[in-house]
Amino acid sequence: MKETENRGRVPRLRFPEFRESGEWETIPLSQLAKRSTQKNNRGELNSVLTNSAEFGVVDQRDYFDKDIATQGNLEGYFVIEKGDYVYNPRISKMAPVGPISKNNIATGVMSPLYTVFRFNNSHNDFFAYYFKTTGWHQYMRQTSSTGARHDRVAVTNGDFMAMPLPVTLLEEQQKIADCLSSLDNLITLEAQKLGALKTHKKGLMQQLFPAEGETVPRMRFPEFRDAWQIRKLEEIADFFKGKGISKADIDPQGQTPCIRYGELYTEYNESIKNVFSRTNVSPSELFLSRANDVIVPASGETKIDIARASCVKLDQVALGGDLNVLRPNIDGLFLSYILNGPAKEEIARTAQGDTVVHLYASQLKLIDLPVPGHEEQQKISDCLSSLDDLITAQAQKVGALKTHKKGLMQQLFPVLDDTPG
């Protein structure tokens, strides 16, 4: 595959055997596919599918963990067969004009709010990949408006089916689809490896820490034999509270590294070795970490979600408001792992609130924890930390492959510059 001059309707990257095949055509969707408007009139189908921006077409029960549509109102739903495509007009950060996805699972029914269509040619994976690019977004923006709810695109059926699509020789279409499919298979394989590592870690943590009501773990390093001691959290840590750092205080060029409580949910795991945010707030107005501190959110959305902890391995990191700061006299990383493992359910039970959940130091102090000697603490935290390093490296590999795929798709399809104004 070689990069070509971006002249006319030609992709930037093209397989060598097609470089002399000329420009691609632009053909309206209506000439390549037909809308599917078959209704579930007798209610014979009860498998309700949905089209999510992240996962594509999935069973509604798997996506929402429950049935959203009820059996009585399925007769007005569209039938969607395996191989059909569906447009969901709901906009999101991942799908700014709504997602178009191919149904690769099974025949089912779709909400009448969706647009279902079927390509004339059954070999159409090429278009499934095209719809994952942003190449068609500009057309949708120019021919539609945001619905009354401000979270949906309003587009007529005629305008939608008039959408221009890039078309080349069937052989080139198939080559592109095969290339991207191979990359998808690689991403799936690496993601499965990542999942296996996470599952292994979860099982290992269950064996390296004593079960509830016990003082000896099921799996133990051979040099250790003494029973673990049950200690209240207030006996092994001093408690502090972080100081507020607003979003406006974040400065990529700031002098002081900082952690805001929301980042515990998105950026960090049990060990914090590198910090992503910085601030220029005066150090005198900040609460600064000592290496080995453990931080726990003071507020969150759900009780189980708030039950998490991270060990800050660095000195002089500003710790934001809404963070409980524990300064332990034991190994902080060990404490972080045990709070995320066997103590997680107990922490969740102590949290208070419904819409916004709070976790107070006074509650955390009373939690009982099984604690071994310092050398065994270190051995356990080193073991789990090494596994975390493998998980991080594998996650970065999966992320890099996804980024590569995204960039490749943008280059394998030409830019359409003749959309209506």
Residue ranges and their predicted role:
Residues 42-50, 142-144, 246-254, 350-351:
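Short coil/turn segments at secondary-structure boundaries
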